[in-house]
Amino acid sequence: MSVPTLSNKPETVDLLVLAPGEKKVTCTISDKGDCNIFVIKLEDHTIGNLIKIQLCQDPKVLFAAYRQPHPLQNAIEITIKPKGYAGVKLLSDNVNNILSQVATLKENFAKKIQKYKESNSYYEDY
């Protein structure tokens, strides 16, 4: 007996690699003209939620949300309603802020591991 397959399941390579000439991020303006809608390909809820939380903490942003349009599509949409600022700049600044926070976290984590190894003789063999 054969194993049933999902006919609408995308190819694995389409979930991991952008097609030639395809852009990672695209930006459109909402129908009302007050929001920027960014589509980020090859990303999921992990980065979407992180960016949304960072944007919601920014005083230059009135509204921020994200959604994954379809579970079989490996893309997210981030909607930003800025307070008179350029949405592209807001997204860029907030992503750079996230990268800075991650770098700080990584540095602090490495320091704590080193301090733990120095105080614990069990790890001297490694």
Curated annotation (Swiss-Prot):
Q: What is its main location?
A: nucleus
Subcellular location as annotated: Nucleus
The reply on keyword Transcription is: yes
State the Gene Ontology terms under molecular function.
DNA binding; DNA-directed RNA polymerase activity; protein dimerization activity
Q: Which GO terms describe its cellular component?
A: RNA polymerase II, core complex; RNA polymerase II, holoenzyme
Q: Which family does it belong to?
A: Belongs to the archaeal Rpo11/eukaryotic RPB11/RPC19 RNA polymerase subunit family.
Q: What is this protein called?
A: Probable DNA-directed RNA polymerase II subunit RPB11
